[in-house]
């Protein structure tokens, strides 16, 4: 029986859903970071449980032809790019396979063609948002990412998947914090001032927002810092302070103060303008979000007479992108601030046929149904946990001709598709989309039609 710190030669047979290598030894399934199928490795045993175990690569005896050496192992250790060691074409294949496996194993569906994953021409430096912790490492204030499953900061200058101008602003701000001797947050001692830097950048507008997350309100010499930042980065339109004095993993506290400029920035997506606040949910990969939303619109095959329900509507990015092509859009979102943003975004784009409510999707559906609203298409974009049974039942009771499902988790999508099929809807096509290159995450669009 293998035990901790034993070293054994193994061959990696597959990848897990989150990109770990899988090896089978003595009836145990081992999960090994930074190991790819067909690779032969010397593996150190880290932990053994009842049926599964964890190992690490001690050395490679034979490497995969699909291993990418563009990335240092540090990026894998932080989880920034947990698939960055796999060539990009194979990443896309892996993501398609995740969707196929989920549909087959969870929904029992294997007769639907899952299209090749839509990918990026340049699958790095794509993120329009960064959330970076500030800590002391070896006596110096540093910015970077935490190592996986820990709160030990790994200092980073090039974040690989973030917009390069965002990286430059983070490094510049870090240097100013050092220069002005502002103390980084110490989680253990609950001391220090600067907890996090959050940066957002409009992909098309170039407008930048910087949020300083602090433990208290006073920031020494903040006016001089702001002056230097806007002199070096004229695209910075908003500098905000957020105060978070709680012992929590949540990045933001409840209090926001605008220190410079506006409290929002703007960007465009599929031709519409959007106002983005520090807390707004806005897809972090603009180019691929446009492909995702356009795929959902194409699948829905909308007509000028259609009434569409946009469930989980956020700040309106999906519904507003097709509103001018249909009769009416009814949007529901549980976060009230997002609904207010959606209404502002509709006004900003002179769109008058959208109707938003702040409520649970289930309650909104019941209310619309009572009012006699009959949707032709229901478009859903739920969080990772997927849809509730009650939502699925309420949506099918309205008898739309199509349900277009945007998913960020193939397993919960497959579970939901199974219930939709039991209630008289048929899955007809699925398109995976790579919103998060270099990571194991995959989004997809699925079309269900009334049988």
Swiss-Prot record:
Family: Belongs to the class I-like SAM-binding methyltransferase superfamily. RNA M5U methyltransferase family.
UniProt enzyme class: transferase
UniProtKB keywords: Methyltransferase, S-adenosyl-L-methionine, Transferase
Residue positions of the active site: 408 (nucleophile)
Domain TRAM residue range list: 1-59
PANTHER family named among the record's database cross-references: RNA M5U METHYLTRANSFERASE (PTHR11061), TRNA (URACIL(54)-C(5))-METHYLTRANSFERASE (PTHR11061:SF30)
Pfam family name, one: TRAM
Single GO biological process annotation from the record: rRNA base methylation
Protein name: Uncharacterized RNA methyltransferase SMU_788
Keyword DNA damage attached: no
Enzyme Commission number, as recorded: 2.1.1.-
Entry superkingdom: Bacteria
Binding residues annotated for S-adenosyl-L-methionine, in chain numbering: 283, 312, 333, 381
Annotated GO MF terms: rRNA (uridine-C5-)-methyltransferase activity
